[in-house]
Structures are given as C-alpha cells and as structure tokens.
C-alpha cells in the first residue's frame, strides 16, 4: 500500500477511535469537557502518521465532537497544537517519550494559554482560566501516559515499526 494511503487510512481509523472513546470517557470541568482519550490518540498519531496527518485528525475530531455534543471549542487549540508539537518532537528525536512530552507541552501549556482569547470572545470570566489550565495539564498528562505505556509495550514486543511518522 502507498505510504500516503496508509497514513490516510490510519488517520481515519484514529479519528473514529477518538470519537467513540470520547463518547465513553469524558470529564466535565467548568466550561470545558476534558477528554484524556484525545491526547492518547494524538500521541498515537504523532508516532504513526506524523504531525500533519495528526493535525488533520485533531481538527476533524474536534469538529465532529462539537457536532455530536461531546466537545467544546476549547478542543481546537489544545488538540491541534498538542499533536503538532508531539509529531514534530517525535520526528526529530524518534523517541516515544518525546511524543508524549510534546503532547503534554503543546496541549497542557501552550494550548491552554491559547484559550485565553477564546474565553474573552466567548465572554467567559478570565478568572476561570486557572481551572481550565489545570484541566488541560491533567488530562493531557493522563492521555499522553496511556499512549506512552501502550507504545512502549508495542516497542518491547517488536510490534512498533521504527520508521513510523
């Protein structure tokens, strides 16, 4: 199978997994709905398909989750920045830990800071930023760690192709 076709197919499967898992596991925290599975899928995308297909996955997943009522507009900056940084870090260092760290930094820190202008536009009290910040940190950490342990298990059993991404 052509590499682009493989990546597109895998991205579609990961989008479907994300939508299904987001229906099952959701943690409402203030004005956001936290989905650790989004971060889990983001790390898998960073490793298996790279930053650009991962970015498409995050965008499409966020749109679909909003349409189905299982997401919020805060999903866009967090998931998209997180997977992009995770994919770039994985491509540079080829270590699963860097993909997980990239997701955590991209979503937990940078993505949460990017919600400030959205909060202003949506007329949400900026005093609620800190709970949102901590929710982003905690959920991106949880999802990233789940993906890290799964990928390390696959790597130990020689089921992870090192040429991914």
Language-model regions, residue ranges each:
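Loop-helix junctions at membrane interfaces
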Residues: 1-165
């Amino acid at each position: 199978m052509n590499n682009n076709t493989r990546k597109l197919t895998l991205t579609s499967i990961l989008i479907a997994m994300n939508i299904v898992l987001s229906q099952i596991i959701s943690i409402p925290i203030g004005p956001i709905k936290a989905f650790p599975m989004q971060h889990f899928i983001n790390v898998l995308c960073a490793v298996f398909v790279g930053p650009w297909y991962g970015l498409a996955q995050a965008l499409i997943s966020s749109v679909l989750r909003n349409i189905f009522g299982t997401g919020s507009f805060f999903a866009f900056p967090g998931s998209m920045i997180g997977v992009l940084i995770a994919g770039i870090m994985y491509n540079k260092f080829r270590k699963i830990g860097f993909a997980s760290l990239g997701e955590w930094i991209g979503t937990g820190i940078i993505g949460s800071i990017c919600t400030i202008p959205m909060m202003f536009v949506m007329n949400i009290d900026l005093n609620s930023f800190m709970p949102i910040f901590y929710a982003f940190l905690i959920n991106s950490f949880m999802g990233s760690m789940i993906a890290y342990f799964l990928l390390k298990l696959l790597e130990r059993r020689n089921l992870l192709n090192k040429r991914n991404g």
